[in-house]
Amino acid sequence: MFTCEAGIASVQQAIKDVAEGKFVIVIDAASRENEGDLILAGEKVSTEKMSFLLSHTTGIVCASLSREQAKSLDLPAMVQDNQCAFKTAFTVSVDASSGVTTGVSASDRTRTVQLLADPAATAESFVRPGHVFPLISQPGGAVQRPGHTEAAMDLMRLAGMQPCGIFAELVNPDHSMMRQQQVLAFAEQHDLTVITVDDLITYRYTYDSLVTKISSARLPTKYGDFSIHVYESIIDGTQHFALVKGDIHEQEAVPVRVHSECLTGDILGSCRCDCGAQLDMAMRYIAEEGLGVIVYLRGQEGRGIGFGHKIRAYALQDLGYDTVDANLQLGFPIDAREYGMAAQVLKDLQLTSVRLITHNPRKFFELQRLGIHVLDRIILPVSISTENEGYLRTKKERMGHWLDLPVLDDVEEEYETVERMSCR
């Protein structure tokens, strides 16, 4: 069932507030800046609102713009070699070219922001440098880059505003950065809506259309005929696909496998993992049921770290690291995969509810969080060998996977029907 009503409701309220010219607060991840920013629609700015912004923040007023806007206003990158930890895309700073004095006062910066939000403004409307800092938003918004720049732009678009949101980082009276509890107290004091960047990303995966179906065909396989549907992400152009068996339109309790790309396991028959066996068993199960879907997510090699890094992790595993510590040693999360595109594909297929073929609790609950009605899970046998036993036990013991692993000596007797048992 859907499990993030509070976050979704907060985003809906934030969108309403932005449209009404109110400030909202957006908090990013603790692993990122871990800060709260006041955000306001540029076209709704006033001297009074600018004064409030300057009084409670660092005073560095940023304005999110699209790449096209920056180009039309002749706003090049501030530096050619961006060494910022989060690659924040600053352009040269600006002031309005008329109607201001020094450019730094609340009224002067209000005038500058109003021009940035004005679609009739031109490059000649500004002087450079100045006291307002335009930032270029990634075209995919917060889904592509989970920063305040993109969050501001997403909120402007969702609220029907001009694509220019202003924002600045909240600070305490001693000018230290506000952290989450301080931000929440400030929001309560000033009756402001607070959302997180993750809330906004979830909202977009739930309500936006972020994939486009680009082709479909019949696909005969060793398990019979499937239909294959290719989807392209509008965020980064990655092409994912769905294998469909039977008439699934508005069906309930449809068996679904969400499978992350694994070239070594799915194609090369690697014995280090059970990915290829899981894919085979899911296809067989769905074929026998006569109904089901396999969503194949491209670009998720090595639990999202990429193919080259996955092979580096293999080398570390040969030195004694398990699959978790190998990722950490390379500087990556244990599991960097996201399932938003899977949710998008399932929604496009118009499934009412699903039964998920998985041992992975994170996948199960993440799809629920993204609005997919997951009724229950389907457990298929585990393909275990001397080569992948440690990998599977790490998934069970360190990643919490729902795995009931047999004693290896009993494998062939217990799971004689499971393919890919030749890995010794």
Swiss-Prot record:
Binding site residues for D-ribulose 5-phosphate: 32-33, 37, 145-149, 169
EC nos: 4.1.99.12, 3.5.4.25
GO CC annotation terms, alphabetical: cytosol
Cofactor(s) listed in the protein's UniProt record: Mg(2+); Mn(2+); Zn(2+)
Site (Essential for DHBP synthase activity): 131, 169
Binding site for Mg(2+) 2: 33, 148
Record field: catalytic activity: D-ribulose 5-phosphate = (2S)-2-hydroxy-3-oxobutyl phosphate + formate + H(+); GTP + 4 H2O = 2,5-diamino-6-hydroxy-4-(5-phosphoribosylamino)-pyrimidine + formate + 2 phosphate + 3 H(+)
Single GO MF annotation: manganese ion binding
Disulphide-bonded residues: none
Binding site for Zn(2+): 262, 273, 275
Residue ranges that the Swiss-Prot or TrEMBL entry lists as coiled coil: none
Keywords: GTP-binding, Hydrolase, Lyase, Magnesium, Manganese, Metal-binding, Multifunctional enzyme, Nucleotide-binding, Riboflavin biosynthesis, Zinc
CC cofactor note: Binds 2 divalent metal cations per subunit. Magnesium or manganese.
Spans annotated as GTP cyclohydrolase II: 207-424
Active site: 335 (proton acceptor), 337 (nucleophile)
Domain of life (superkingdom): Bacteria
InterPro entries in the record: DHBP_synth_RibB-like_a/b_dom, DHBP_synthase_RibB, GTP_cyclohydro_II, RibA, RibA-like_sf, Riboflavin_synth_RibBA
UniProt record, GO biological process: riboflavin biosynthetic process
Pathway the protein acts in: Cofactor biosynthesis; riboflavin biosynthesis; 2-hydroxy-3-oxobutyl phosphate from D-ribulose 5-phosphate: step 1/1; Cofactor biosynthesis; riboflavin biosynthesis; 5-amino-6-(D-ribitylamino)uracil from GTP: step 1/4
Manganese listed as a keyword: yes
Residues holding Mg(2+) 1: 33
Family according to the record: In the N-terminal section; belongs to the DHBP synthase family.
Protein name listed in UniProt: Riboflavin biosynthesis protein RibBA
Lineage of origin: Bacteria, Pseudomonadati, Chlamydiota, Chlamydiia, Chlamydiales
Gene: ribBA
